[in-house]
């Protein structure tokens, strides 16, 4: 396991936990640790997920955390880009968080997740 991989994983975990606490605090959602482990688990179970699917998955995480709808993720098929519905849900749920602040966290998380997947030793 190379050092770059370890560093990216550590940073990914740190930012993901920070983001989750922030979002859950703002919208009064579930306990941050629950969402942190939930998202982390799904990411670790799909290490070879194509880059084109990361965006839809992240949007689902964002919508699920903000709307606190536990069934939303389970019913979502990433093969179908339901961006319009997800974005609408986000707009409804994110009223209490400044849009630029929310976007800043998710841009950072998306970058880290891409790095995390790219440097996994068994991923091309």
From Swiss-Prot:
Entry keywords, A to Z: Late protein, Virion
Cell compartments where the protein resides: Virion
The protein's name in its UniProt record: Uncharacterized protein H124R
Cellular component per GO, a single term: virion component
Family (UniProt): Belongs to the asfivirus H124R family.
Predominant localisation class: virion
UniProt superkingdom: Viruses
Induction: Expressed in the late phase of the viral replicative cycle.
